[in-house]
C-alpha cells in the first residue's frame, strides 16, 4: 500500500473543508434552504467528497473535513464561533461539535493506522517520495527540489488553477461563477496533491 495514502487523505479532507468554507462564506446556502434540509445536504456533500475505504479512514476524513470547514469559515469571517443553531453548541467560544468531530477523526485515523500498518509523515511526504527504494531515485523524486527549481510544470499549472479559483471566489458576486470556481478549486487541489504524491514533475 502507498505509504502516502493517509497523508493524501488528510490533505484532501482539509482541502475540501477549505473549499467549502469559501463557498459558504460567499454563498450562504443556509439562508435559502430550511435548516434540517441544509444539514442533510451538507452531510451528503461531505460524505461524497470524502468517500474512501476502509471505513475508519472514511470516518476520519469525513469528520476532519467538517471540522476544518467550520474552522476556516470562522477564520475567513473573522468571527468568534457562536451558536447559530441547536445542533452547534458553543461554550465560551469553543464549538463543542467541532471538538467532537476532531476527537472522532483522531480515533478513526488511529484505528486505521493500528490495523493497516499505515504511517504518515507530512514533512517526509513533501520532500521525498519514499515509494522509491534507491537513494538516487529518491533524490530524483524529491518534489520540493523539483518544485523550487522549475522542474514541476504540471504542478505549476494545477497551483495556478487553485490560485485563480480562490481569487474568483473571493471577488465574484455570481452564484454560478462561485460554484464553478469552487469546483475548479477542488479539482485543482486534488490534481496538485495527486501529482506531487506520484512524483510527477515533467
Curated annotation (Swiss-Prot):
<keyword id="KW-1043">Host membrane</keyword>
<feature type="transmembrane region" description="Helical">
    <location>
        <begin position="13"/>
        <end position="33"/>
    </location>
</feature>
<feature type="transmembrane region" description="Helical">
    <location>
        <begin position="87"/>
        <end position="107"/>
    </location>
</feature>
<feature type="transmembrane region" description="Helical">
    <location>
        <begin position="40"/>
        <end position="60"/>
    </location>
</feature>
<protein>
    <recommendedName>
        <fullName>Putative transmembrane protein ORF202</fullName>
    </recommendedName>
</protein>
<keyword id="KW-0812">Transmembrane</keyword>
<feature type="transmembrane region" description="Helical">
    <location>
        <begin position="156"/>
        <end position="176"/>
    </location>
</feature>
<keyword id="KW-1133">Transmembrane helix</keyword>
<dbReference type="GO" id="GO:0016020">
    <property type="term" value="C:membrane"/>
</dbReference>
<feature type="transmembrane region" description="Helical">
    <location>
        <begin position="177"/>
        <end position="197"/>
    </location>
</feature>
<dbReference type="GO" id="GO:0033644">
    <property type="term" value="C:host cell membrane"/>
</dbReference>
<keyword id="KW-0472">Membrane</keyword>
Amino acid at each position: 500500500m502507498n505509504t502516502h495514502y493517509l497523508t493524501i487523505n488528510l490533505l484532501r479532507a482539509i482541502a475540501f473543508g477549505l473549499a467549502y468554507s469559501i463557498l459558504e462564506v460567499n454563498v450562504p446556502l443556509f439562508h435559502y434552504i430550511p435548516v434540517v434540509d441544509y444539514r442533510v445536504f451538507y452531510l451528503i456533500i461531505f460524505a461524497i467528497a470524502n468517500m474512501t475505504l476502509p471505513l475508519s479512514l472514511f470516518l476520519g476524513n469525513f469528520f476532519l473535513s467538517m471540522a476544518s470547514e467550520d474552522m476556516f469559515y470562522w477564520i475567513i469571517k473573522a468571527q468568534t464561533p457562536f451558536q447559530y443553531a441547536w445542533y452547534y453548541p458553543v461554550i465560551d467560544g469553543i464549538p463543542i461539535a467541532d471538538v467532537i468531530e476532531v476527537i472522532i477523526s483522531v480515533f478513526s485515523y488511529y484505528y486505521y493506522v493500528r490495523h493497516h500498518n499505515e504511517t504518515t509523515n507530512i514533512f517526509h511526504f513533501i520532500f521525498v517520495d519514499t515509494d522509491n527504494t534507491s537513494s538516487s531515485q529518491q533524490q530524483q523524486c524529491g518534489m520540493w527540489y523539483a518544485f523550487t527549481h522549475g522542474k514541476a510544470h504540471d504542478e505549476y499549472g494545477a497551483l495556478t488553477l487553485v490560485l485563480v479559483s480562490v481569487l474568483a471566489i473571493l471577488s465574484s458576486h455570481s452564484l454560478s461563477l462561485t460554484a464553478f470556481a469552487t469546483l475548479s478549486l477542488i479539482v485543482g487541489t486534488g490534481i496538485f496533491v495527486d501529482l506531487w504524491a506520484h512524483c510527477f514533475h515533467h
